[in-house]
A protein has these predicted regions:
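N-terminal periplasmic/intermembrane-space "pro-region" immediately following the signal or transit peptide
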Residues: 18-111
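Short loop/turn motifs that connect adjacent beta-strands in outer-membrane beta-barrel proteins
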Residues: 23, 46-50, 68-70, 80-92, ...
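Outer-membrane beta-barrel domain signature
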Residues: 47, 106-112, 142-146, 183-186, ...
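Transmembrane beta-strands of outer-membrane beta-barrel pores
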Residues: 98-104, 127-129, 138-142, 161-163, ...
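Residues that define the transmembrane beta-barrel architecture of outer-membrane proteins
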Residues: 112-119, 147-155, 188-198, 233-237, ...
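Outer-membrane beta-barrel "beta-signal"
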Residues: 194, 241, 446, 467-481
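Signature for the C-terminal beta-barrel architecture of outer-membrane proteins
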Residues: 194-375, 399, 411, 419-426, ...
Length: 481
C-alpha cells in the first residue's frame, strides 16, 4: 500500500491539480462564495443541487453588481474560478493529503478526505460541450472500506446537447438547502456509480403559462451500488426538481428508490410500480416481500431569502424526507431546518449559520430511518449513508461560520453536538453504536501561489462511549492555470 502511495505521490509532484471546468463537483469554497453572494442579494444561483454548471454560474454573475468592497472580493473569487474555463484544454492533476484518525468526526459538505494518507492523480479533457475527468486515488488507513486498492471516485465522462448534460461516472451528489447535510442525497459515502442528467443553464420557461416558475433545474440519476451485500447489484434511482417562482423563494422536491438486484424482480412492471410508488410498504415485516418493489424515500425542501424580501442578509431553510408511502405523501419523516446570515466586518466577509437535524421517524426512535426489511444493508453504501452523514435515528445541532480573511485565505469552523445511532443499528458504519458527540472542526484554505493551494485542518471530538479525539490534517493541490 505504501509503495502505491509513493508511486502516485511521485506522479503528483511532477503534475498539477485541476479539474474539468464545465461542471463543478461538490466544492465547499465555491458553495460558500455563491451562498454569501446570494444572501447579500448580489446573485441568484441555486446551490441546492450539485454538480453545478459553469454556464449557470456565469449567467448570474454576468449581471451582478458589487456595491461594497466585501461583495467585490467574493464576486471576484467566483469570476477567477470561471476565468480558468477554456473551450479546449487538457489538464493533468495530482493531490496529496495526510491526516490523523478521524473515526468520530462528523462529515460535512465536500468532505472527501477519507483516509489517513491519500494520493490522487489524473487527467481532464475539456471541450465546449463535453468533458472527461479520469482520476485514480490510492488510500491508506481508509475510513470507508471499499475492498479496492485503487479507487476512481470523481471520474466521469459528460456531454451537453440542447442545454442538457448527461454525465456518466462516479461523482458526488447533493440535494437540499442544508449547509452540513442533506436528508436524501448527501456526499458522506463513496459516490454511487451511474448516470446523471440535468440542465446546463437554469433559465425560466419561455411559455406564458410556465414562466411564473422562474429559474428551474431538474436532476435524474440511475446507478448501481458497489459492495451491497444484502442484495448484490441493487440499483438506485432518483429525481429532483427545483424552481424559484420569486427571487426570495426556492422550492425543491426529491425522490429516490432502491430497486432490483440479485433475487429481486427486475421486470418492467416491477420498475413501473417502484416509479409510481404503488405497492410500496404493503408487505412490510411480512415474509412475503415479492409485492414490495423498492425502498423509497421522498420529500420537499424550501429556502427563503430575506435579502430579496425584506432587505435582511439572511436565509431560512428547511427540508423533510420520509418513507415514500404508496398512494400518499411521505410518512415517518426526518427533518432539517436552519438559518444563516452573511455580512462583513472591517471589509472581511463572513457567514454564520445554525442547523438542526432530526433523522428519527417523526421524532421517534424506531430503527426505520434509512432502513428496509428487504434491502437490509439500508440506505447506505459500504456502511456510510447516502443521506445525512450521521445516518438514521440521529439528532444534531450545528453552529458554523465562514470567514474570508482576504482573497487568499478562507476559514471554515463548526461546533456540533449530536446524538447518533439511537436505534443502535449495526448497518451504520459511520457511527456503529449509540453515542453522544460534541465536536469542533476548523479548516483553513490558503492560496499559497496562483497554482498552489494548501489546506490545513484541526478538530476535537468528545464522545460518551469512546476516548476524546484530537486530530489534524493537511493537503496540497497544484493547478495548471
Amino acid at each position: 500500500m505504501y509503495k502505491k502511495l509513493g508511486v502516485l505521490l511521485g506522479f503528483s509532484l511532477v503534475t498539477f491539480a485541476a479539474s474539468a471546468q464545465n461542471l463543478h463537483m461538490n466544492d465547499l469554497k465555491l458553495k460558500a462564495d455563491i451562498d454569501w453572494l446570494n444572501t447579500q442579494g448580489v446573485t441568484q444561483i441555486s446551490t441546492s443541487t450539485w454538480p453545478l454548471t459553469a454556464n449557470e454560474i456565469r449567467r448570474s454573475i454576468s449581471v451582478a453588481t458589487a456595491q461594497t468592497q466585501a461583495q467585490q472580493q467574493v464576486l471576484q473569487s467566483v469570476k477567477i474560478r470561471l476565468s480558468n474555463n477554456r473551450e479546449s484544454v487538457v489538464q493533468a492533476f495530482g493531490e496529496l493529503s495526510l491526516q490523523t484518525s478521524r473515526q468520530q468526526l462528523p462529515q460535512a459538505f465536500a468532505d472527501n478526505k477519507l483516509a489517513g494518507q491519500q494520493a490522487m492523480v489524473g487527467i481532464a479533457l475539456t471541450e465546449r460541450d463535453w468533458e472527461a475527468n479520469i482520476q485514480a486515488t490510492v488510500k491508506n488507513d481508509k475510513l470507508i472500506d471499499d475492498s479496492s486498492d485503487v479507487s476512481f471516485e470523481g471520474s466521469y465522462l459528460a456531454g451537453n446537447y440542447a442545454n442538457q448534460w448527461l454525465i456518466g461516472g462516479k461523482i458526488p451528489t447533493w440535494w437540499g438547502p442544508g449547509h452540513d447535510g442533506s436528508l436524501i442525497r448527501g456526499d458522506a459515502s463513496i459516490p454511487v456509480t451511474g448516470f446523471t442528467m440535468q440542465r446546463d443553464i437554469q433559465n425560466a420557461p419561455t411559455s406564458q403559462y410556465l414562466s411564473w416558475l422562474g429559474p428551474w433545474q431538474y436532476q435524474l440519476f440511475a446507478g448501481q451500488f458497489d459492495d451491497y451485500e444484502a442484495v448484490p447489484d441493487a440499483k438506485l434511482f432518483g429525481a429532483r426538481l427545483t424552481a424559484s417562482p420569486w427571487p426570495w423563494l426556492e422550492l425543491g422536491a426529491s425522490r429516490t428508490f432502491m430497486w432490483g438486484g440479485e433475487g429481486r424482480p427486475e421486470s418492467l412492471s416491477s420498475f413501473g410500480d417502484a416509479l409510481l410508488g404503488t405497492k410500496d410498504n404493503e408487505s412490510t415485516n411480512s415474509s412475503d416481500s415479492v409485492d414490495d418493489p423498492a425502498n423509497q424515500l421522498g420529500g420537499f425542501d424550501a429556502k427563503l431569502n430575506l435579502s430579496s424580501l425584506i432587505n435582511v442578509p439572511s436565509n431560512v431553510y428547511g427540508q423533510y424526507i420520509g418513507e415514500d408511502e404508496a398512494g400518499g405523501l411521505p410518512a415517518k419523516n426526518m427533518y432539517l431546518a436552519g438559518v444563516d446570515y452573511a455580512s462583513s466586518i472591517q471589509g472581511k466577509p463572513y457567514q454564520l449559520y445554525a442547523e438542526y437535524t432530526d433523522t428519527r421517524s417523526s421524532g421517534d426512535v424506531e430503527g426505520i430511518s434509512y432502513d428496509h426489511f428487504i434491502y437490509t444493508d439500508g440506505y447506505y453504501q459500504q456502511g456510510y449513508p447516502l443521506g445525512y452523514a450521521l445516518g438514521g435515528d440521529a439528532e444534531s445541532i450545528a453552529i458554523g461560520s465562514r470567514v474570508w480573511l482576504d482573497n487568499r485565505n478562507f476559514i471554515n469552523a463548526k461546533l456540533q453536538h449530536a446524538k447518533v445511532n439511537q436505534a443502535d443499528e449495526a448497518i451504520n458504519q459511520a457511527f456503529p453504536e449509540e453515542d453522544k458527540l460534541t465536536s469542533i472542526d476548523v479548516s483553513w484554505e490558503h492560496q499559497w501561489q496562483p497554482l498552489t493551494k494548501v489546506t490545513s485542518r484541526v478538530w476535537a471530538v468528545d464522545s460518551d462511549n469512546r476516548s476524546s479525539d484530537i486530530g489534524v490534517g493537511a493537503s496540497i493541490e497544484l493547478k495548471t492555470y
